[in-house]
Structure formats: structure tokens, C-alpha cells
């Protein structure tokens, strides 16, 4: 019995160490995905054992066969998790590997397709985002049925197509109609322009008379031109001062005098100097009113350019107080500490 065992042990031979090295290297290549043809061949390459014994070759082939399923599972899992770009551009080796993996596990082959198809359907060309819709949204303008032009305020524009008698804003003096309130204000200022200038001329002649004497003719003329003389003049004066949305210059001598004539209780000495800065002293726009004050009623240093007016110091022309800049003077001084307050 012992002789039989000894003879069996004499017939069993192990493969050389170099063959195990080749086996380990082949398994590493299979695990790293470097051997693309490993899934198509049942045995690993270069596994011939050079000792000439059949048992050693059989044992080495069995070892390689035992390692192959594990390496195939690893490569299959790697391909399903990290080879998503290969779905768009497959190679020959990857195509064969994907076919084998799809036949082995259908769920693994479907899940990468679903992952790729999801983002493409969301970010497709047919889907529009709210941001792009907001950018491409046109401005809301309505077309005029008469002139076929587009306007933001179509109701106001339609009034321009009406006759002057049918327009909504009418002048109380000549009964002419206007489409906008600002147009009516400018029209009223034209009615007052000649009358105010004539009043100023008569008053200046009255004050500058030679020898301090006034002729009866001049006195009669002055009485005729007094704003409070007739009901018509008073109505015109009242309509000019009571127009809503207007801006009145607090330093205009003509406008201040007209306001005092309308409201006698306000007749008192002023603590500032007035000036004949404007024909009427009434403005329909706030920006025009502020530009008028900055240009004519604030004194800048000599040689100051127009672009530097907001940053240089100066003083009020009517009371002499100094300020850091014209904006501080306009916001804190005009109409509060200096200037006439209208009714």
C-alpha cells in the first residue's frame, strides 16, 4: 500500500513558478479590462506548461478555468457601471462583450440605457425653459386701428386722431382740446406769455419813471393790466396756478407776485432775493424743473464744467449760504429754508 502511494506521489508534478506568474498576470489583465478577447475564449492565453507532463497541463487548465468565471463577473460589472460612453460609439470587442452581458443579465443592460435616455429627454431641443420664454417675449404694445402703428398707451394715442373740439383736455380760455394734460399746460402758458410780459413791462415803466412822477395815462394802463381787475383775468390766473402736477419755481418774481395777488393774506416781505428767471415759472416735468434750479439759482465756483456740477461746492444765489454740492442744496434748502411756498 505504501508502495502504491509512493508511486502516485512520484507521478504528481507541480507546474513551475513561471506558469503561476503567467496565470496571475492574465487574471490581472482580465480584471483591468485590458484583454478584450477574454470573454470569447474559454482559456487564458499563453498558458502552455513546458514540463511535458499531461497532469500538470490539466491542472493548469483547471486553475485557469476556475479563475475565468470570477474575472468575467468582474469585467461584466465594470462594463455595466463605467462604460456608458461606449453605448454611443461601440467597438468590436465591446459590442461582443455587451451582447454576452445582455444575454447573461438583461436588467444590467437596460439600466445604462435608461440612465442615458433620461437626461436627453429633459434637455431636448423641443423643451423650452421659462428663462428662454421670458427673453423672447415681445413688449406689450397695441396696434392703432387708424394709423396701424403700435403704442403702449393706445387710449391716449387715439385721442390724437380726434378733432381739437373732441379731445379730452380742453383749454378754459379758447376751448381747444388736447390729447395730453402736458400739452394743455404748454398751451395755457402761451396764453399767459404775452400778458405776463406786458404786465412786467408796465410795472417796470411805472417804477422807473423819471422824476418819480407817474402820468395819468400810465396809471390807467396799469389799472387795466392788473390781474385782479376782471373776472376773466382772475379765472386765467387761477387756472394757471391750480393745474395739477405742475412744478413752480420758488424764486420767480413774476409768479410770486401773481400768487400774492390771488391770496392777499400771503403778502409779506420775503427773506430772500427774487429773480425774473423764467417767463411763467411753471414747469410740467420734474426733471426740467430741477435742471432750471441747478442752472440758474445755484452759484458754482468759476470755471466749473457742466459735468462736474454735482460734485463741487457752491452757494445759494438768493441767501448766500454755502453747501457741499448742488444736490444737498436742492434737497435740504430749496422750499424748506429758502424760497417761496405756493398755495
Curated annotation (Swiss-Prot):
Additional comment: Present with 1240 molecules/cell in log phase SD medium.
C2H2-type zinc-finger residues: 169-191
Natural source organism: Saccharomyces cerevisiae (strain ATCC 204508 / S288c) (Baker's yeast)
Top-level taxonomy: Eukaryota, Fungi, Dikarya, Ascomycota, Saccharomycotina
InterPro entries: Transcr_Reg_ZincFinger, Znf_C2H2_sf, Znf_C2H2_type
Region (Disordered): 31-56, 71-140, 198-222
Sites of Phosphoserine modification: 71, 111
Cell compartment(s), UniProt: Nucleus
UniProt biased composition (Polar residues): 33-45
Coarse class of the protein's main subcellular location: nucleus
A GO MF term: sequence-specific DNA binding
Protein name: Zinc finger protein STP3
PANTHER family given in the database record: FI01119P, ZINC FINGER PROTEIN
Gene3D superfamilies according to UniProt: Classic Zinc Finger
Compositional bias per record (Low complexity), positions renumbered to this chain: 46-56, 71-86, 94-120
Keywords assigned: Metal-binding, Nucleus, Phosphoprotein, Zinc, Zinc-finger
Any one Gene Ontology cellular component term annotated for this protein: nucleus
Amino acid at each position: 500500500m505504501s508502495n502504491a502511494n509512493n508511486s502516485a506521489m512520484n507521478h504528481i508534478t507541480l507546474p513551475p513558478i513561471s506558469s503561476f506568474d503567467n496565470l496571475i498576470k492574465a487574471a490581472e489583465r482580465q480584471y483591468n479590462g485590458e484583454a478584450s478577447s477574454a470573454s470569447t475564449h474559454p482559456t487564458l492565453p499563453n498558458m502552455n506548461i513546458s514540463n511535458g507532463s499531461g497532469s500538470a497541463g490539466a491542472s493548469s487548465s483547471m486553475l485557469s478555468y476556475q479563475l475565468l468565471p470570477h474575472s468575467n463577473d468582474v469585467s461584466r460589472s465594470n462594463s455595466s457601471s463605467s462604460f456608458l460612453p461606449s453605448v454611443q460609439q461601440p467597438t468590436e470587442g465591446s459590442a461582443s462583450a455587451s451582447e454576452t452581458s445582455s444575454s447573461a443579465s438583461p436588467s444590467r443592460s437596460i439600466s445604462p440605457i435608461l440612465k442615458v435616455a433620461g437626461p436627453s429627454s429633459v434637455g431636448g431641443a423641443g423643451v423650452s425653459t421659462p428663462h428662454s420664454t421670458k427673453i423672447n417675449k415681445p413688449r406689450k404694445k397695441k396696434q392703432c386701428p387708424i394709423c396701424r402703428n403700435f403704442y403702449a398707451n393706445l387710449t391716449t394715442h387715439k385721442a390724437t386722431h380726434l378733432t381739437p373740439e373732441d379731445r379730452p383736455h380742453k383749454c378754459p380760455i379758447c376751448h381747444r382740446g388736447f390729447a395730453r394734460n402736458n400739452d394743455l399746460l404748454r398751451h395755457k402758458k402761451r396764453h399767459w406769455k404775452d400778458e405776463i410780459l406786458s404786465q412786467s413791462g408796465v410795472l417796470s415803466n411805472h417804477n422807473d419813471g423819471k422824476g418819480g412822477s407817474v402820468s395819468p395815462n400810465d396809471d390807467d394802463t396799469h389799472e387795466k393790466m392788473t390781474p385782479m381787475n376782471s373776472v376773466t383775468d382772475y379765472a386765467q390766473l387761477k387756472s394757471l396756478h391750480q393745474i395739477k402736477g405742475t412744478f413752480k419755481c420758488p424764486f420767480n418774481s413774476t409768479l410770486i407776485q401773481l400768487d400774492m395777488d390771488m391770496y392777499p393774506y400771503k403778502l409779506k416781505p420775503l427773506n430772500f432775493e427774487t429773480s425774473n428767471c423764467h417767463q411763467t415759472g411753471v414747469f410740467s416735468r420734474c426733471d426740467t424743473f430741477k435742471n432750471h434750479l441747478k442752472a440758474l439759482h445755484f452759484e458754482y465756483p468759476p470755471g466749473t464744467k457742466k459735468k462736474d456740477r454735482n460734485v463741487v461746492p457752491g452757494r445759494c444765489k438768493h441767501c448766500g449760504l454755502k453747501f457741499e454740492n448742488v444736490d444737498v442744496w436742492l434737497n435740504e434748502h430749496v422750499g424748506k429754508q429758502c424760497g417761496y411756498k405756493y398755495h
